[in-house]
Design a protein with these regions (language model features):
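Short hydrophobic alpha-helical runs that function as membrane-insertion/retention elements
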Residues: 75-78, 133-135
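C-terminal lobe/tail of nucleotide-utilizing enzymes
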Residues: 97-145
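ATP-dependent carboxylate-amine ligase catalytic core
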Residues: 1-71, 79-102, 106, 115-119
Length: 145
């Protein structure tokens, strides 16, 4: 389900228009046209997914994975590392291999406790065949209650 409030937040942050790409409400052609129109003059387009990558209104129908596949958008996984370390390896492996037509380019971790913690996460990425792109440290000052 798209979050219609997010587009306003995106516009404030990016300084340009933001739209929803809704696989339930829009045809594939309309999604492609919207994406082409709103990214035609952009150097970079950040496309935020909703819920989990493969969650849609009917299994994967309307999911972020479906939109990514349709538009050939590379995927950066954002992984909560709060209570895990090397155990993310099979999770990453599964996301990379569940649909071979998708382009999972890497992972960013949040809630990382230390550089040592991140070293386990980097090793998990390496063993799962997913690039570790970085992390956001655990920081009470920026947590949302």
């Amino acid at each position: 389900m798209p979050d219609y409030i997010d587009t306003r937040h995106h516009k404030m942050a990016a300084g340009c228009a933001s739209v929803n790409l809704d696989g339930f409400m829009m045809s594939e052609g309309h999604i492609k046209d919207l994406y082409a129109r709103y990214t035609s003059n952009a150097d970079v387009a950040v496309t935020e997914g909703v819920m989990g990558l493969f969650d849609g209104y009917d299994a994967m129908r309307g999911s972020s994975a479906e939109i990514s596949g349709l538009l050939r958008i590379p995927i950066v996984l954002v992984v909560n590392a709060k209570s895990t370390a090397y155990s993310v390896a099979p999770l990453l492996y599964g996301f990379r291999n569940f649909r071979k037509d998708l382009n999972v380019v890497g992972a960013v971790f949040n809630f990382v406790a230390s550089e040592s913690h991140y070293s386990f996460l980097r090793q998990a990425c390496e063993d799962a065949g997913v690039e570790a792109l970085g992390y956001l440290p655990k920081c009470a000052d920026v947590e949302i209650p």
